[in-house]
């Protein structure tokens, strides 16, 4: 069974709401008798998942994540992963948890055959917040991407008059928006798409951050949309050049192509603005949100767009079984989180400046590049070093409260000294 060296946890950047802990461990320490802890070790957790679960992840164990957190052995860790930006506000936010429990005790599930008192309230709040006419809620981030693609194709045939079965959607090289067949059909990572053919037709790739290549692709009159992440997280936190999104907006308008912004990871203040596209004050035709949208308690996504695009979706064409049920109450609660997120944008910028300043003190022969925006950041490890070996060195047992990392590839990470910073100021 795969077991990394002793113990390690986490990469990417932590919550902009301060230092919120998550309990994780790679190790085999004996269980401690602590109030509220199960009598089970991390080793037992690993073995059970290895035996009964699909082997699609190498991960840590976690028992509790709230405030000061504990793992199976009672160890405490700082969460610099934030569930890939799904828990920007921290784990188990009490207001959101309490609201969801309250709703679950009242009504848990209906279908779209019924109205509820929550959905319209949520839709009004979200559309007014981001200045769109309509929102289509879904369950997961990848469903948000799928929904945006379906809307784009409908718009292509109904409004742009693209010939039947000829609509094309352009994606940026090294994109990542999920693991469905549609998402992997847009991928350029062999680990995502190998041995899963045939792929979705009508998807084409252009180089990321290259407006000349994009304009050349737009010469094809059958191109109906361009989907892009303002910062490519899975590719290694790769940000676009300043001015790129402004040019994309201009090109999409010029060639009558829909601009789709995938803000599943970057949205809701992660980059220091409510949306990453806000750094250039551009408005996409379709906006995809997810992850932190629910406050980290439930898979929820949303696609926002204006009426002239929304009108292409007719009754029966697209829905989801569970997405409209009263669990939307959690989204009503998440309005509190979104409001706080707006207030915390400036705080994210302040913390990010400090973080990158400290990261830039790392040895340049090992870490030549530090990149990111707001509190979505990465370090690039020199290719002559093996990233795993570097992490093992970082993971050596230390005294005190130094963070230990878990990472793969030649990017991602953070600085142990951030522990001291957050202990001092939070």
UniProtKB/Swiss-Prot annotation:
One of its GO terms (cellular component) is cytoplasm. Pathway: Amino-acid biosynthesis; L-proline biosynthesis; L-glutamate 5-semialdehyde from L-ornithine: step 1/1. One of its GO terms (biological process) is arginine catabolic process to glutamate. Keywords: Aminotransferase, Pyridoxal phosphate, Transferase. GO terms for molecular function: identical protein binding; ornithine aminotransferase activity; pyridoxal phosphate binding. InterPro entries: Aminotrans_3, Aminotrans_3_PPA_site, Class-III_PLP-dep_AT, Orn_aminotrans, PyrdxlP-dep_Trfase, PyrdxlP-dep_Trfase_major, PyrdxlP-dep_Trfase_small. Its cofactor is pyridoxal 5'-phosphate. It catalyses: a 2-oxocarboxylate + L-ornithine = L-glutamate 5-semialdehyde + an L-alpha-amino acid. It holds the Pfam family Aminotran_3. Its EC number is 2.6.1.13. It comes from the Eukaryota. The modification N6-(pyridoxal phosphate)lysine is found at residue 291. It is an enzyme of class 2 (transferase). Belongs to the class-III pyridoxal-phosphate-dependent aminotransferase family. This is Ornithine aminotransferase.
């Amino acid at each position: 069974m795969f077991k990394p060296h002793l113990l390690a946890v986490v990469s990417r950047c932590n919550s902009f709401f301060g230092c919120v802990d998550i309990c994780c461990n790679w190790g085999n320490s004996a269980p401690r008798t602590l109030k509220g802890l199960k009598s089970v070790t991390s080793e037992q957790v690993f073995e059970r998942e290895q035996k009964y679960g699909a082997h699609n992840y190498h991960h840590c164990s976690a028992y509790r994540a709230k405030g000061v957190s504990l793992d199976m052995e009672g160890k405490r860790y700082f969460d610099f992963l934030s569930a890939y930006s799904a828990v920007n506000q921290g784990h188990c936010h009490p207001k959101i948890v309490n609201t969801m429990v309250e709703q679950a005790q009242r009504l848990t599930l209906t279908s779209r055959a019924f109205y509820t008192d929550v959905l319209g309230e949520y839709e009004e709040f979200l559309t007014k917040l981001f200045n769109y006419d309509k929102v289509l809620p879904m369950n997961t981030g990848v469903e948000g991407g799928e929904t945006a693609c379906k809307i784009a194709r409908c718009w292509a045939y109904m409004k742009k008059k693209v010939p039947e079965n000829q609509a094309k959607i352009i994606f940026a090289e090294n994109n990542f928006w999920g693991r469905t067949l549609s998402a992997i059909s847009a991928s350029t990572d062999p680990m995502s798409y190998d041995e899963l053919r045939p792929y979705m037709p009508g998807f084409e790739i252009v180089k990321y951050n290259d407006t000349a290549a994009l304009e050349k692709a737009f010469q094809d009159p059958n191109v109906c949309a361009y989907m892009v992440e303002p910062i490519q997280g899975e590719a290694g936190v790769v940000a676009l050049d300043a001015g790129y999104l402004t040019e994309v907006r201009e090109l999409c308008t010029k060639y009558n192509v829909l601009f789709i912004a995938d803000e599943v990871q970057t949205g809701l203040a992660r980059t220091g603005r409510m949306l990453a596209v806000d750094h250039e004050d551009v408005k996409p035709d379709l906006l995809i949100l997810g992850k932190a949208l629910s406050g980290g308690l439930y898979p929820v996504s949303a696609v926002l767009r204006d009426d002239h695009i929304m009108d292409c979706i007719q009754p029966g064409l697209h829905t989801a079984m569970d997405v409209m049920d009263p669990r939307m109450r959690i989204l009503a609660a998440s309005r509190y989180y979104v409001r706080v997120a707006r207030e915390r944008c400036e705080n994210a910028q302040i913390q990010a400046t400090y973080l990158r300043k400290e990261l830039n003190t790392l040895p340049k022969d090992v870490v030549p590049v530090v990149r990111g925006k707001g509190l979505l950041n990465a370090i690039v490890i020199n290719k002559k070093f093996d990233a795993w070996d570097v992490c093992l060195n970082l993971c050596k047992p230390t005294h005190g409260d130094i963070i230990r990392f878990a990472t793969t590839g030649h990017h991602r990470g953070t600085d142990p000294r951030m522990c001291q910073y957050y202990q001092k100021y939070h």
